[in-house]
Curated annotation (Swiss-Prot):
NCBIfam families: PRK05412.1
Disulfide bonds: none
A Pfam family matched in the record: DUF520
Matches recorded under CDD domains: YajQ_like
Family under the similarity heading: Belongs to the YajQ family.
Keyword Nucleotide-binding applies: yes
UniProt keyword annotation of Nucleotide-binding present: yes
Full protein name: Nucleotide-binding protein ETA_25210
Top-level lineage group: Bacteria
Listed GO CC annotations: cytosol
Function: Nucleotide-binding protein.
GO molecular function: nucleotide binding
Length: 163
């Protein structure tokens, strides 16, 4: 029976490249000239520390980071930015986390979305991924299109497509 897995993975090398590109851009931008602004990648905790001298500049920096991530092939939904901006001395800091893996509640929504579509496929949760099986390849491709359209707040990739 044909099947595929729905996963949510991030290539940390591409994240590192995007952070380097963003740091390079803020060093050449006129509106950040003479301002202590930076991006710091922590690969162990899979987070990016965005810091600047004012809160609106932090928001601009997050937009720059999202743009650079998108150019490197990482969707903006993979970056989880808290609403609260920390203020410490004369710097404003946001610790943005990268979403990796499918959480249980999102996996349940994904399974429900596929079941409610009346497609002739079965879906099951396997750890941090969802396996979808069906009798025909066309049904599986319909399920892929459905998942791409479904706004679940997280980017998904499809792998292990087997006939």
């Amino acid at each position: 029976m044909p099947s595929f897995d729905i996963v949510s993975e991030i290539d940390m090398q591409e994240v590192r490249n995007a952070v380097d590109n963003a740091n390079r851009e803020i060093s050449t931008r006129f509106d950040f000239r003479g301002v202590q602004a930076s991006f710091e990648l922590n690969e162990k905790s899979e987070s990016i520390k965005v810091s600047s001298e004012s809160d609106f500049q932090v928001k601009q920096l997050v937009d720059i980071l999202r743009e650079k991530l998108l150019k490197r092939g990482i969707e903006g939904g993979a970056l989880e930015v808290p609403e609260q901006i920390e203020h410490s001395g004369k710097s404003w800091i946001v610790d943005a986390k990268m979403k990796k893996g499918i959480e249980t509640d999102i996996a349940k929504k994904l399974v429900k979305l596929i079941k409610d579509s009346k497609l002739k496929v079965q879906s099951q949760i396997q750890g941090d991924e969802v396996r979808v099986t069906g009798k025909s390849r066309d049904d599986l491709q319909g399920a892929m299109a459905l998942v791409r359209k479904g706004e679940l707040g997280q980017p998904f990739q499809f792998k292990n497509f087997r006939d």
